[in-house]
Amino acid sequence: MAKRIIYNEQARRALERGIDILAESVAVTLGPKGRNVVLEKKFGAPQIINDGVTIAKEIELEDHIENTGVALIRQAASKTNDAAGDGTTTATVLAHAMVKAGLRNVAAGANAITLKKGIDKATEFLVGKIQENSKPISDSNAIAQCGTIAAGNDDEVGQMIANAMDKVGKEGVISLEEGKSMTTELEVTEGMRFDKGYISPYFATDTERMEAVLDEPYILLTDKKIALVQDLVPVLEQIAKTGKPLVIIAEDIEKEALATLVVNRLRGVLNVAAVKAPGFGDRRKAMLEDMAVLTNGQLITEDAGLKLENATLDMLGTGRRITINKETTTIVAEGNEQAVKARCDQIKKQMDETDSSYDKEKLQERLAKLAGGVAVIKVGAATETEMKDKKLRLEDAINATKAAVEEGIVPGGGTTLAHLSPILKEWADKNLEGEELIGANIVEASLTAPLMRIAENAGSNGAVIAENVKTKPFNDGFNAATGEYVDMSSAGIVDPAKVTRSGLQNAASIAGMVLTTECIVADLPEKKDSAAPAGAPGMGGDFDY
């Protein structure tokens, strides 16, 4: 296909147009008074949401070059989402501000490579400052505050996540389900999560989120490599008759068997997903046995004289729901409390008997996975549209609280970055010179962008508020919900340090790449035929065949 090649200023301006469109669509959701965005869907009802990264993923422009700009900024949002699970809108607003300021300097003749060096040095300095100013999370009240802010100022959500963390521990698993009622409920049940995802992405049932969710599945546990599909056929035939999904957790599944499972899954013959078992050697076998106890099934192993080809339905485990993404698998089981408790006691005995600190650590890991359970939040809402929005907010809130537990919290509402702006200026003036200093100044000027946008969305003058906040102590900021200047920590307006750090790093990275772009190669737009072919006689001409 023929390509269009654009150079220099023209290339950067085309990227900038795409970046402007995406940034504006996402920025309207920022802050306590941010608005919602409606996404029109090809199938099903429109979605009304407030989640930056989901909006960014939906935007696609007709112009290929502008679309490249959209894709670049979308990457800043996605990477922040992957690292911290929240702060995607802040990352987008920051990246947009840095690109705008940077392009002005490049157009005026500044060297883009040296500017990028300055941006990178400034970012490194700021990351250190964010870590210096972060406070560790001490109580469930701080967890609730983090959850509340991430969920768009929903106190009920923040409190529910704090309760869930109290019950399953700070490292515990919190899972989301669509509830059957109007209210959102919390329930703690048996379950575990391990760090292995699906073997093939074709097992994903939700292609937008790239995860497989299987309700009431059978679970086949084996410690052998499955090389031939013939080994699986007897058990697959039995399961196909029941109409229930199947999850296979095995040492590995080789190409031929995997291809057969994928084909059956895609044709809708059998809803199946396959996962590699976690761990190695004896530890892998022990973890599979833990899962067998949890799911009320048997581990099919030749050590116990059990073969795959002779497996029956009563040897398989069952669960309430299994969620698998590319990195983790979460099993939610129920009704096996006694068996799980007995297994935990057995692991504790082994811990008492062993002298090896390594074995003790690994046994402790297994015990935590098995005994911790899973907190299930059942999301309730009046309509499906509200349910989807609530689920996204809850997901952000869960990720934000986990990030806060990891790296601590800093004052929220864009306050931390705004206060770091004069500190960065002072450092840059002393330590950098020439165009590197200009690069650092680009970052410094962009740091107030999130606060300004939060204020503007609340109907205030962003520039005035940003200048006022800079003159106040580090903890003081602007509460956009009430329109007052307050001590952010006391008011419960806090952000996880990890979210602020990731957003800044990803924004600076994308801005640096855009500024150093000198040429774009993109597809030429396709010429559309002026006359559309009519349908066959007696048929509508506007069907897609």
From Swiss-Prot:
Assembly mode: Forms a cylinder of 14 subunits composed of two heptameric rings stacked back-to-back. Interacts with the co-chaperonin GroES.
Described function: Together with its co-chaperonin GroES, plays an essential role in assisting protein folding. The GroEL-GroES system forms a nano-cage that allows encapsulation of the non-native substrate proteins and provides a physical environment optimized to promote and accelerate protein folding.
Protein name: Chaperonin GroEL 2
Lineage: Bacteria, Bacillati, Cyanobacteriota, Cyanophyceae, Synechococcales
Provenance organism: Prochlorococcus marinus (strain MIT 9301)
GO cellular component term of the entry, any: cytoplasm
EC number: 5.6.1.7
Pfam families, alphabetized: Cpn60_TCP1 (PF00118)
Listed Gene3D superfamilies: GroEL, GroEL-like equatorial domain, TCP-1-like chaperonin intermediate domain
